[in-house]
Amino acid sequence: MPQLPGETVSFKLERDDENKVRAILHTVYQALQEKGYNPINQLVGYMISGEPAYITSHSEARNLICKVDRDEIMEVLLKSYLQNSMGKGE
């Protein structure tokens, strides 16, 4: 749908997609830990650069994270952080 100049674009992640992203992040986090990496540092590197080399191929973690757009990952992380820090539900 074309946007008018200055109009805010709406982005909505479906609940099933959110659960898929959470499961992938969990798997990637565990794989990075198992290989001795700092999962947070590696995920930040990936999120900033988009370079999959930050993610280990152990347990198919690299293949899994490449199936999800970084904006979807960011939405799930941001939503979780804000809900936990502000004590609010959806």
UniProtKB/Swiss-Prot annotation:
Superkingdom in the source lineage: Bacteria
InterPro entries linked to this entry: IreB
Signal sequence residues: none
Pfam families linked: IreB
UniProt record similarity statement: Belongs to the UPF0297 family.
HAMAP family documented for this protein: UPF0297 (MF_01507)
Annotated protein name in UniProt: UPF0297 protein Swol_0469
